[in-house]
Structure formats: C-alpha cells, structure tokens
Amino acid sequence: MFAGPGSAAVNVASDGAVGQVGIGLSFGLIVMAMIFTFGHVSGAHINPAISVAFFALRRIDAARLAGYVAAQLAGAALAGVAIIAIVGTEGHAGATVPDLHGVGGAFWSELILTFFLALVVLVVATDSRAEGSMAAIAVGGYVAMAATGWGPVAGASMNPARSFGPALAANVWTSHWVYWVAPIAGALLAVAAYHLLREPHAPAERS
C-alpha cells in the first residue's frame, strides 16, 4: 500500500521520472515480495476484493474476513499518510480517479482486471493442480502487467484498500465507489468461473 501508490505520487512530483512502467513494476514487485514473505502466514491477501473471494469460496469465515479487511484498510490509511508526509500533496498520495474514459471506463476496467487477478490468485493458491510456489510470481506478474498497461485508464487499482488509503489521506473521493463495487464484483465473478473450471475433474483443493 506504500510502494505502489507511493511510486505514482513520486511520478507526479518528479515530472514523470518513474514512468508508467516503473509504476507497474513497483506494484507488481511489492505484491510478489509480500506473497513470498507473508503468504504462508496469512495468505497475504492485502486486498479486500481477494478476501471477499476467499470468503465466497468458504476458505475463510466472516470473522476472519472482517479482520483482514480492517487490517488492510488500516494499513492503507497509514501508507497514505506516510506518502503525503514524504512526497507532499502533489500526486494526491497516488489516489485513483476515473481518467481517460470516465466512470464507465473505470468501472469496466476495474471489474475485468480484478476478475482475472482474482482468478489467478484462486487457481494458484487453492488448486492442487497448480504450482503453489509460483503463486507470488504469477500474481505479481499479473499486477505489474495490469498496472502498466491499464493504469492510465483509472489507476488499475484492483484493490479497494489501495484506493481507500490515498483517498483518505489526500481527501480525494471522486467516484470512489467504483473502486469498491467493481473490484468486488469482479472477484465474485472469478469465484463463479473458478467453480466452472474445477467442476469437470474436481481435484482436491490445497489447504
């Protein structure tokens, strides 16, 4: 929640020194590092939409979902404040707002990007046919690709907490609902797709 949005804020403050590729890599590499570091401890969801997907898949209960989301939002808020303190208000702490194609473009891009993100996470993290040790690379690589290619549309957030922290710190709430509704809807659609993908052979799920 610090490295990715922070890189977006630094890019604005430095007149584009980081670049879109640099921003995408910042997001992807930090996600990869967090999964490698904390995946075996808590699952390293770091994303309310992913936690909702695991809840819908009955991998976590309501109490754990609430705890995960609360921790994710608290961490994002602290990261947003830290970005403002270090970089200043220029760049709005990396806040996400609809850009190139308005609210409609933001909604559909966030829904579709999060659908594929959640599908990747669910398959590599829970399906016994997948190589679990590669989860961090698969997920981090996808995030880097999505953030690089689709960031200019609406931020390529794919993560309500990632959008919440900067919005709170910079007080930028423009169409903020998009960054909750679309990612969660995309994640739930990914759960449905995951069930369809598994149904023909119904392999054991990884615990």
PLM region spans:
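Membrane-interface helix-loop junctions and terminal tails of multi-pass membrane proteins
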Residues: 1-207
